[in-house]
Amino acid sequence: MDIVKNEFISDLLGIYGKLLTDYQLEIMELYYFEDLSLSEIAIDKDVSRNAIFTLIKRVEKILLDYENKMKLNEKIKKVENKIKDEKLKEDILNILLEGE
């Protein structure tokens, strides 16, 4: 798996994950965060490997569509690049991502 793509999709999951169904989010977390293979997820969920592959590709497209429309990841990266104080940066990102 491409490391840059993996990091990008992981970022998008952190931002837009709550907009996915519970099942979509669970599969994406297993694949991207738990590093399970398509086959391992398919066995665990009692579905075909192709069903998992198709779902992951569909959700990746959904996440990219969200980012193309809302540009939240792009804006977050701009904020990260402008702020030098690491504690302040962390506090701002927590507020942006968690709404606190």
Locate each region found by the language model:
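Short, Lys/Arg-enriched N-terminal segment that forms or immediately precedes the first helix
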Residues: V4-G17
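Short amphipathic alpha helix immediately N-terminal
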Residues: D22-E34
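Helix-turn-helix DNA-binding elements, focusing on the entry/boundary residues of the two helices
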Residues: I27, S37-S39, K45
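Hydrophobic positions on the alpha-helical face of helix-turn-helix-like DNA-binding modules
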Residues: I41-A42, I52
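Helix-turn-helix DNA-binding motif, specifically the short coil turn and the N-cap/start of the second
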Residues: S48-R49
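Residues within the DNA-recognition helix of helix-turn-helix
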Residues: L55-R58
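C-terminal flanking helix
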Residues: E60-E67
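Intrinsically disordered, low-complexity basic tails/linkers immediately adjacent to helix-turn-helix/homeobox/MYB/SANT
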Residues: M70-L93
